[in-house]
């Protein structure tokens, strides 16, 4: 229930409108470029905020744009799903799994700073996002 309260407050504070405007700019870049920009932007945002509220917020924004053709919209949904989930792996605060990992490391007295975590996680997160980018482009070719 808290998630919906956060989204409701963000909607009434016009935060969703501002983010929606920025997402619209990304989408306007074109079918392929815009989708990839959406993937990488949602990954970037997800690395510094929890991915579940981010996904819910972006879903609401994408759903509010009825003018997008269905095959392009499918690519956008995949971009948001992959970006918000995989981007959370970049930092120790981006997803529940990384928070758990950091907690376990602290419990076993394994020293790892925030920057150290990012340095070790970045290559894996970037590789995952590159694979997701290729996957989305292949799906886009199939849908078109």
What does each of the following model-derived ranges do?
Residues 1-5:
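Hydrophobic mid-bilayer segments of alpha-helices in multi-pass membrane transport proteins
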Residues 8-12, 47, 133-141:
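Short hydrophobic alpha-helical membrane-anchoring segments
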Residues 9-110:
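Membrane-interfacial helix-loop connectors
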Residues 82, 86-144:
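Juxtamembrane and boundary regions of transmembrane helices in multi-pass small-molecule transporters
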């Amino acid at each position: 229930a808290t998630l919906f309260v956060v989204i409701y407050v963000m909607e009434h504070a016009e935060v969703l409108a501002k983010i929606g405007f920025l997402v619209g700019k990304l989408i306007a870049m074109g079918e392929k470029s815009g989708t990839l920009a959406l993937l990488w932007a949602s990954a970037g945002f997800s690395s510094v905020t929890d991915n579940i509220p981010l996904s819910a917020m972006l879903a609401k924004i994408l759903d509010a744009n009825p003018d997008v053709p269905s095959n392009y919209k499918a690519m956008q949904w995949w971009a948001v799903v992959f970006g918000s989930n995989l981007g959370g792996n970049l930092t120790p605060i981006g997803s529940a799994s990384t928070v758990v990992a950091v907690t376990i490391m602290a419990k076993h007295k394994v020293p790892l700073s925030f920057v150290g975590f990012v340095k070790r996680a970045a290559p894996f997160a970037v590789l995952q996002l590159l694979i997701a980018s290729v996957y989305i482009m292949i799906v886009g070719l199939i849908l078109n």
